[in-house]
Amino acid sequence: MSATLILEPPGRCCWNEPVRIAVRGLAPEQRVTLRASLRDEKGALFRAHARYCADARGELDLERAPALGGSFAGLEPMGLLWALEPEKPFWRFLKRDVQIPFVVELEVLDGHDPEPGRLLCQAQHERHFLPPGVRRQSVRAGRVRATLFLPPGPGPFPGIIDIFGIGGGLLEYRASLLAGHGFATLALAYYNFEDLPNNMDNISLEYFEEAVCYMLQHPQVKGPGIGLLGISLGADICLSMASFLKNVSATVSINGSGISGNTAINYKHSSIPPLGYDLRRIKVAFSGLVDIVDIRNALVGGYKNPSMIPIEKAQGPILLIVGQDDHNWRSELYAQTVSERLQAHGKEKPQIICYPGTGHYIEPPYFPLCPASLHRLLNKHVIWGGEPRAHSKAQEDAWKQILAFFCKHLGGTQKTAVPKL
């Protein structure tokens, strides 16, 4: 009897959904090595492997069988995805074209390391980023440069604006996945894209106000307010939008700081001065990587510092997602300072969820950890922090928390996928 790789769901599913991996037709207690690999849009190779032992019936189910070593160990049904590592050092795992799925190659080989034996069976699994029925619309409205993702069905739907960090450009993968959960989601570019500025001399909230108005005027978006989701600098822009703009019903910050960091944040006649930084505080770590966690100037006066975003002006609830091993900046300290500022002004504490062993780039579920990569502005490879297993678990939970938060405060229904064999 020949070995067979069984995947559930077979063929394809969304990246943020689990896939159940099993092997049948092995010899009783046969030792095997499972390998996973994929290439991103730039051809960069990512790989993971793990060693397993079949049961007495010659079957192997990754939901029941612990990995005996390799890229990970223990009971990790999705380990072959979250443990993927780039062949090229410090290469960040990203999805740039959500219309084309990633193709994961799965192989089962006889025996264990150092050199597994012959190939027993193999399969492909497509991991896509455009959920069934989700509609993708390019947006060029006034100054707004974005992509809108609409869920299947007649609508209208609760709306979210999704903003990324200092890398600029237009990243759509989080917005497209959110649309699969019933949210009309606008992936918004704000610099280094088409005719937008190539750098950030200052952050003008009037541009982001245009995006809010666009969403609320869209017939498929349900008002009266919208949600905001941002990571890193994008999170600080979202916190600023919540503080100054109308019709923001709920805000999620992923490893934001609540501070105007490197450049002023302006809205009409108001301006938040930048806190600033000192590159002399860069630390050189292993392999020539640099650690920038302490380059920002001290937050003198704590929550009263003039570079703090006036988050007490926000009308809707706030969720702060925090990686406790974030090496971009001191996210946990900043989250506590935001909370202190809100309480000092008689406002409710924000919801803060802290994840140990978790770095800066908290992505949708099953994204591999990016422990270090090239920093766009510094042009150096910097440490982002995180430990693979803890970071992966944090991403799974954070995604659930974000969906639940927006469902509660914007309206909507959650969808879950539980694969069964």
From Swiss-Prot:
The active site is at S232, D326, H360. The modification N6-succinyllysine is found at K313. GO terms for cellular component: cytosol; peroxisomal matrix; peroxisome. It comes from the Eukaryota. Keywords: Fatty acid metabolism, Hydrolase, Lipid metabolism, Peroxisome, Serine esterase. Its main location: other. Its EC number is 3.1.2.3, 3.1.2.2. InterPro entries: AB_hydrolase_fold (IPR029058), Acyl-CoA_thioEstase_long-chain (IPR016662), BAAT_C (IPR014940), Thio_Ohase/aa_AcTrfase (IPR006862), Thio_Ohase/BAAT_N (IPR042490). Gene3D superfamilies: Acyl-CoA thioester hydrolase/BAAT N-terminal domain, alpha/beta hydrolase. A motif (Microbody targeting signal) lies at residues 419-421. The keyword ATP-binding does not apply. Pathway: Lipid metabolism; fatty acid biosynthesis. GO terms for molecular function: carboxylic ester hydrolase activity; fatty acyl-CoA hydrolase activity; succinyl-CoA hydrolase activity. Strongest expression in liver and kidney and weaker expression in placenta, heart, and muscle. Belongs to the C/M/P thioester hydrolase family. Compared to mouse peroxisomal succinyl-coenzyme A thioesterase/ACOT4, the human enzyme has a broad substrate specificity overlapping the activity of three mouse acyl-coenzyme A thioesterases, providing an explanation for the unexpectedly low number of acyl-coenzyme A thioesterase genes in the human genome. Catalyzes the hydrolysis of acyl-CoAs into free fatty acids and coenzyme A (CoASH), regulating their respective intracellular levels. Functions as a peroxisomal succinyl-coenzyme A thioesterase that can also hydrolyze glutaryl-CoA and long chain saturated acyl-CoAs. This is Peroxisomal succinyl-coenzyme A thioesterase. It comes from Homo sapiens.
